[in-house]
Protein backbone atom coordinates (compact mmCIF):
# COMPACT_ATOMS: atom_id res chain seq x y z
CA UNK A 1 0.00 0.00 0.00
CA UNK A 2 1.58 3.35 -1.00
CA UNK A 3 2.45 5.86 1.68
CA UNK A 4 0.35 8.93 2.29
CA UNK A 5 3.28 11.25 1.49
CA UNK A 6 3.61 9.83 -2.02
CA UNK A 7 -0.13 10.17 -2.56
CA UNK A 8 0.03 13.81 -1.47
CA UNK A 9 2.88 14.51 -3.90
CA UNK A 10 0.99 12.87 -6.77
CA UNK A 11 -2.19 14.76 -5.96
CA UNK A 12 -0.26 18.05 -5.77
CA UNK A 13 1.36 17.46 -9.16
CA UNK A 14 -1.93 16.44 -10.76
CA UNK A 15 -3.71 19.49 -9.37
CA UNK A 16 -1.05 21.86 -10.74
CA UNK A 17 -1.08 20.11 -14.12
CA UNK A 18 -4.81 20.78 -14.36
CA UNK A 19 -4.23 24.52 -14.36
CA UNK A 20 -5.21 26.33 -17.61
CA UNK A 21 -2.56 26.26 -20.33
CA UNK A 22 -2.75 30.04 -20.59
CA UNK A 23 -1.60 30.40 -17.00
CA UNK A 24 1.24 27.93 -17.61
CA UNK A 25 2.48 29.88 -20.65
CA UNK A 26 2.34 33.12 -18.70
CA UNK A 27 4.28 31.46 -15.89
CA UNK A 28 7.03 30.32 -18.28
CA UNK A 29 7.34 33.81 -19.76
CA UNK A 30 7.55 35.24 -16.27
CA UNK A 31 10.36 32.82 -15.42
CA UNK A 32 12.34 33.97 -18.48
CA UNK A 33 11.69 37.58 -17.54
CA UNK A 34 13.04 36.92 -14.04
CA UNK A 35 16.15 35.30 -15.51
CA UNK A 36 16.83 38.31 -17.74
CA UNK A 37 16.38 40.71 -14.87
CA UNK A 38 18.72 38.63 -12.72
CA UNK A 39 21.42 38.98 -15.38
CA UNK A 40 20.76 42.71 -15.66
CA UNK A 41 21.15 43.44 -11.95
CA UNK A 42 23.68 40.72 -11.13
CA UNK A 43 26.75 43.04 -11.01
CA UNK A 44 25.14 45.04 -8.17
CA UNK A 45 24.53 43.23 -4.89
CA UNK A 46 22.05 45.90 -3.74
CA UNK A 47 19.97 45.66 -6.93
CA UNK A 48 20.15 41.85 -6.89
CA UNK A 49 18.99 41.67 -3.28
CA UNK A 50 16.21 44.18 -3.99
CA UNK A 51 14.98 42.09 -6.91
CA UNK A 52 14.67 39.02 -4.67
CA UNK A 53 12.99 40.89 -1.83
CA UNK A 54 16.00 41.13 0.51
CA UNK A 55 16.72 37.41 0.59
CA UNK A 56 20.45 37.76 1.30
CA UNK A 57 22.04 39.14 4.49
CA UNK A 58 24.13 42.32 4.11
CA UNK A 59 27.31 40.45 5.08
CA UNK A 60 27.37 38.77 1.67
CA UNK A 61 27.87 42.05 -0.19
CA UNK A 62 31.66 41.66 -0.16
CA UNK A 63 31.54 38.07 -1.40
CA UNK A 64 32.24 37.05 -4.98
CA UNK A 65 29.15 35.79 -6.82
CA UNK A 66 28.37 33.09 -9.37
CA UNK A 67 24.96 32.63 -11.01
CA UNK A 68 23.57 29.42 -12.57
CA UNK A 69 20.13 29.11 -14.19
CA UNK A 70 18.04 25.91 -14.41
CA UNK A 71 20.74 23.48 -13.37
CA UNK A 72 19.93 19.83 -14.18
CA UNK A 73 20.84 17.99 -11.02
CA UNK A 74 20.32 14.25 -10.66
CA UNK A 75 16.87 14.58 -9.04
CA UNK A 76 15.65 18.14 -9.56
CA UNK A 77 16.15 21.19 -11.76
CA UNK A 78 16.25 24.25 -9.50
CA UNK A 79 15.41 27.52 -11.20
CA UNK A 80 18.42 29.39 -9.85
CA UNK A 81 21.61 28.61 -7.94
CA UNK A 82 23.48 31.60 -6.49
CA UNK A 83 26.92 30.91 -5.03
CA UNK A 84 28.68 33.41 -2.75
CA UNK A 85 32.42 32.75 -2.56
CA UNK A 86 34.72 34.25 0.10
CA UNK A 87 36.22 37.64 -0.83
CA UNK A 88 39.77 36.23 -0.93
CA UNK A 89 40.28 33.60 -3.61
CA UNK A 90 42.67 31.61 -1.42
CA UNK A 91 40.47 31.75 1.65
CA UNK A 92 39.00 28.59 3.17
CA UNK A 93 35.92 30.39 4.48
CA UNK A 94 32.36 29.15 4.14
CA UNK A 95 30.73 29.18 0.71
CA UNK A 96 27.06 30.20 0.81
CA UNK A 97 24.90 28.61 -1.88
CA UNK A 98 21.26 29.65 -2.37
CA UNK A 99 19.12 27.12 -4.24
CA UNK A 100 16.05 29.10 -5.33
CA UNK A 101 12.70 28.01 -6.73
CA UNK A 102 10.54 30.70 -8.35
CA UNK A 103 6.75 30.44 -8.21
CA UNK A 104 4.53 32.72 -10.29
CA UNK A 105 0.98 33.40 -9.10
CA UNK A 106 -2.08 35.18 -10.45
CA UNK A 107 -2.55 37.05 -7.15
CA UNK A 108 -0.12 38.16 -4.47
CA UNK A 109 1.10 35.44 -2.12
CA UNK A 110 1.78 35.88 1.58
CA UNK A 111 2.27 33.90 4.76
CA UNK A 112 -1.44 33.10 5.00
CA UNK A 113 -2.16 32.35 1.34
CA UNK A 114 0.54 29.63 1.16
CA UNK A 115 -1.42 27.83 3.87
CA UNK A 116 -5.04 28.36 2.86
CA UNK A 117 -5.13 29.43 -0.80
CA UNK A 118 -5.72 26.41 -3.03
CA UNK A 119 -3.13 27.15 -5.73
CA UNK A 120 -0.59 28.89 -3.49
CA UNK A 121 -0.52 26.02 -1.02
CA UNK A 122 0.01 23.50 -3.83
CA UNK A 123 2.86 25.57 -5.27
CA UNK A 124 4.39 25.91 -1.82
CA UNK A 125 4.27 22.14 -1.24
CA UNK A 126 5.73 21.46 -4.69
CA UNK A 127 8.56 23.92 -4.03
CA UNK A 128 9.41 22.23 -0.74
CA UNK A 129 9.63 18.87 -2.49
CA UNK A 130 11.87 20.27 -5.22
CA UNK A 131 14.21 21.91 -2.71
CA UNK A 132 14.48 18.73 -0.69
CA UNK A 133 15.52 16.84 -3.82
CA UNK A 134 18.18 19.49 -4.54
CA UNK A 135 19.66 19.02 -1.05
CA UNK A 136 19.90 15.28 -1.68
CA UNK A 137 21.78 16.02 -4.93
CA UNK A 138 24.30 18.19 -3.09
CA UNK A 139 24.77 15.41 -0.55
CA UNK A 140 25.88 13.12 -3.42
CA UNK A 141 28.62 15.67 -4.26
CA UNK A 142 30.08 15.46 -0.76
CA UNK A 143 33.73 14.40 -0.45
CA UNK A 144 33.82 11.00 1.30
CA UNK A 145 36.94 11.72 3.35
CA UNK A 146 36.55 15.43 3.88
CA UNK A 147 39.32 17.89 3.17
CA UNK A 148 37.16 20.15 1.02
CA UNK A 149 35.52 23.51 1.66
CA UNK A 150 32.40 23.95 3.76
CA UNK A 151 29.30 24.82 1.72
CA UNK A 152 26.19 26.16 3.42
CA UNK A 153 23.32 25.34 1.03
CA UNK A 154 20.22 27.46 1.72
CA UNK A 155 16.97 26.27 0.04
CA UNK A 156 14.69 29.22 -0.75
CA UNK A 157 11.24 29.86 -2.23
CA UNK A 158 10.37 33.14 -3.97
CA UNK A 159 6.81 33.97 -5.14
CA UNK A 160 6.26 36.51 -7.92
CA UNK A 161 2.92 37.90 -8.97
CA UNK A 162 2.80 37.57 -12.76
CA UNK A 163 2.60 41.33 -13.39
CA UNK A 164 4.82 42.52 -10.54
CA UNK A 165 8.48 43.49 -10.59
CA UNK A 166 9.24 42.45 -7.01
CA UNK A 167 8.37 39.27 -5.12
CA UNK A 168 5.25 39.20 -3.00
CA UNK A 169 6.59 36.49 -0.67
CA UNK A 170 9.85 34.65 -0.04
CA UNK A 171 11.15 32.22 2.53
CA UNK A 172 14.62 30.82 3.23
CA UNK A 173 14.69 27.46 5.03
CA UNK A 174 17.25 25.83 7.27
CA UNK A 175 20.56 25.37 5.50
CA UNK A 176 22.49 22.16 5.04
CA UNK A 177 26.27 21.94 5.39
CA UNK A 178 28.38 19.88 3.02
CA UNK A 179 32.11 19.33 2.61
CA UNK A 180 32.65 19.91 -1.12
CA UNK A 181 35.42 20.58 -3.63
CA UNK A 182 34.59 24.14 -4.72
CA UNK A 183 36.21 24.09 -8.18
CA UNK A 184 34.61 20.76 -9.11
CA UNK A 185 31.14 21.81 -7.94
CA UNK A 186 31.30 25.13 -9.81
CA UNK A 187 32.33 23.32 -12.98
CA UNK A 188 29.55 20.78 -12.47
CA UNK A 189 26.90 23.49 -12.04
CA UNK A 190 28.13 25.34 -15.12
CA UNK A 191 28.03 22.25 -17.34
CA UNK A 192 24.57 21.18 -16.11
CA UNK A 193 22.75 24.37 -17.05
CA UNK A 194 19.93 24.04 -19.56
CA UNK A 195 21.40 24.71 -23.03
CA UNK A 196 18.43 26.57 -24.52
CA UNK A 197 18.16 28.87 -21.52
CA UNK A 198 21.94 29.30 -21.48
CA UNK A 199 21.93 30.44 -25.15
CA UNK A 200 19.09 32.84 -24.47
CA UNK A 201 20.84 34.32 -21.48
CA UNK A 202 24.15 34.52 -23.37
CA UNK A 203 22.43 36.57 -26.09
CA UNK A 204 20.95 38.81 -23.42
CA UNK A 205 24.39 39.23 -21.82
CA UNK A 206 25.98 40.16 -25.18
CA UNK A 207 23.24 42.68 -25.86
CA UNK A 208 23.78 44.27 -22.46
CA UNK A 209 27.53 44.48 -23.08
CA UNK A 210 27.00 46.10 -26.50
CA UNK A 211 24.60 48.61 -24.97
CA UNK A 212 27.08 49.49 -22.25
CA UNK A 213 29.93 49.88 -24.75
CA UNK A 214 27.76 52.00 -27.05
CA UNK A 215 26.91 54.36 -24.21
CA UNK A 216 30.58 54.81 -23.36
CA UNK A 217 31.71 55.31 -26.97
CA UNK A 218 28.80 57.47 -28.15
CA UNK A 219 29.74 60.95 -29.42
CA UNK A 220 27.16 63.78 -29.29
CA UNK A 221 25.85 64.73 -32.72
CA UNK A 222 26.68 68.39 -32.29
CA UNK A 223 30.24 67.57 -31.35
CA UNK A 224 30.57 65.09 -34.21
CA UNK A 225 29.30 67.64 -36.74
CA UNK A 226 31.67 70.25 -35.35
CA UNK A 227 34.58 67.88 -35.70
CA UNK A 228 33.53 67.00 -39.26
CA UNK A 229 33.17 70.70 -40.13
CA UNK A 230 36.59 71.44 -38.73
CA UNK A 231 38.12 68.71 -40.82
CA UNK A 232 36.34 70.00 -43.95
CA UNK A 233 37.54 73.55 -43.29
CA UNK A 234 41.09 72.32 -42.86
CA UNK A 235 40.92 70.50 -46.19
CA UNK A 236 39.54 73.58 -47.96
CA UNK A 237 42.23 75.81 -46.49
CA UNK A 238 44.88 73.33 -47.60
CA UNK A 239 43.48 73.40 -51.16
CA UNK A 240 43.55 77.22 -51.27
CA UNK A 241 47.10 77.27 -50.01
CA UNK A 242 48.14 74.86 -52.73
CA UNK A 243 46.43 77.03 -55.38
CA UNK A 244 48.15 80.19 -54.19
CA UNK A 245 51.51 78.46 -54.25
CA UNK A 246 51.29 78.13 -58.05
CA UNK A 247 51.00 81.88 -58.62
CA UNK A 248 48.74 84.90 -58.21
CA UNK A 249 46.63 84.07 -61.28
CA UNK A 250 46.24 80.40 -60.63
CA UNK A 251 42.74 78.96 -60.37
CA UNK A 252 41.64 76.26 -57.96
CA UNK A 253 40.81 73.07 -59.83
CA UNK A 254 40.46 69.48 -58.80
CA UNK A 255 43.51 67.27 -58.78
CA UNK A 256 42.03 64.82 -61.28
CA UNK A 257 40.99 67.59 -63.68
CA UNK A 258 44.38 69.27 -63.52
CA UNK A 259 46.17 66.01 -64.07
CA UNK A 260 43.93 65.05 -67.02
CA UNK A 261 44.19 68.40 -68.81
CA UNK A 262 47.93 68.57 -68.24
CA UNK A 263 48.50 65.11 -69.62
CA UNK A 264 46.31 65.75 -72.67
CA UNK A 265 48.11 69.01 -73.51
CA UNK A 266 51.48 67.36 -73.09
CA UNK A 267 50.45 64.50 -75.38
CA UNK A 268 49.26 66.89 -78.10
CA UNK A 269 52.47 68.87 -77.97
CA UNK A 270 54.60 65.77 -78.05
CA UNK A 271 52.55 64.35 -80.95
CA UNK A 272 52.83 67.47 -83.10
CA UNK A 273 56.56 67.80 -82.44
CA UNK A 274 57.23 64.15 -83.18
CA UNK A 275 55.20 64.34 -86.39
CA UNK A 276 57.02 67.49 -87.43
CA UNK A 277 60.44 65.95 -86.77
CA UNK A 278 59.75 62.53 -88.24
CA UNK A 279 57.93 63.80 -91.35
CA UNK A 280 60.54 66.40 -92.14
CA UNK A 281 57.90 69.12 -92.42
CA UNK A 282 55.50 67.09 -94.55
CA UNK A 283 52.81 67.17 -91.88
CA UNK A 284 52.99 70.97 -91.45
CA UNK A 285 50.33 71.72 -94.15
CA UNK A 286 47.91 69.29 -92.54
CA UNK A 287 48.39 70.92 -89.15
CA UNK A 288 47.81 74.39 -90.65
CA UNK A 289 44.67 73.21 -92.44
CA UNK A 290 43.31 71.77 -89.18
CA UNK A 291 43.97 75.08 -87.40
CA UNK A 292 42.11 77.01 -90.15
CA UNK A 293 39.14 74.64 -89.85
CA UNK A 294 38.94 75.13 -86.09
CA UNK A 295 39.17 78.92 -86.49
CA UNK A 296 36.40 78.93 -89.12
CA UNK A 297 34.13 76.86 -86.89
CA UNK A 298 34.71 79.26 -84.02
CA UNK A 299 33.90 82.28 -86.21
CA UNK A 300 30.71 80.65 -87.50
CA UNK A 301 29.60 79.83 -83.96
CA UNK A 302 30.22 83.43 -82.87
CA UNK A 303 28.29 84.90 -85.79
CA UNK A 304 25.35 82.52 -85.47
CA UNK A 305 25.09 83.25 -81.75
CA UNK A 306 25.23 87.03 -82.33
CA UNK A 307 22.66 87.23 -85.20
CA UNK A 308 19.42 85.42 -85.92
CA UNK A 309 19.45 84.07 -89.49
CA UNK A 310 16.07 82.88 -90.86
CA UNK A 311 16.28 79.68 -92.91
CA UNK A 312 13.92 77.65 -95.06
CA UNK A 313 13.06 73.95 -94.68
CA UNK A 314 16.19 72.91 -96.60
CA UNK A 315 18.44 74.99 -94.33
CA UNK A 316 19.11 77.78 -96.82
CA UNK A 317 19.26 81.28 -95.36
CA UNK A 318 17.02 84.03 -96.66
CA UNK A 319 19.59 86.72 -95.98
CA UNK A 320 23.21 87.03 -95.17
CA UNK A 321 24.33 88.49 -91.82
CA UNK A 322 25.98 91.86 -92.10
CA UNK A 323 29.41 92.29 -90.75
CA UNK A 324 29.97 94.76 -87.96
CA UNK A 325 32.22 97.70 -88.81
From Swiss-Prot:
InterPro entries noted in UniProt: Herpes_UL24
Gene source species: Human cytomegalovirus (strain AD169)
Keywords: Host G2/M cell cycle arrest by virus, Host nucleus, Host-virus interaction, Late protein, Modulation of host cell cycle by virus, Virion
The name this protein goes by in its record: Protein UL76
Family: Belongs to the herpesviridae UL24 family.
Subcellular location: Virion; Host nucleus; Host nucleus, Host nucleolus
Entry function: May participate in nuclear egress of viral particles. Plays a role in the dispersal of several host nucleolar proteins including NCL/nucleolin and NPM1. Since deletion of host NCL/nucleolin negatively impact on nuclear egress, UL76 supposedly acts on this process through its effect on host nucleoli. Induces cell cycle arrest in host cells at the G2/M phase following by apoptosis. The mechanism involves the inhibition of host mitotic complex cyclinB/CDK1.
Chain intervals with Low complexity compositional bias: 247-258
Region Disordered, annotated ranges: 222-284
Induction text: Expressed late in the infection cycle.
A biological process term (GO) from this entry: symbiont-mediated arrest of host cell cycle during G2/M transition
Gene name as annotated: UL76
UniProt GO cellular component terms: host cell nucleolus; virion component
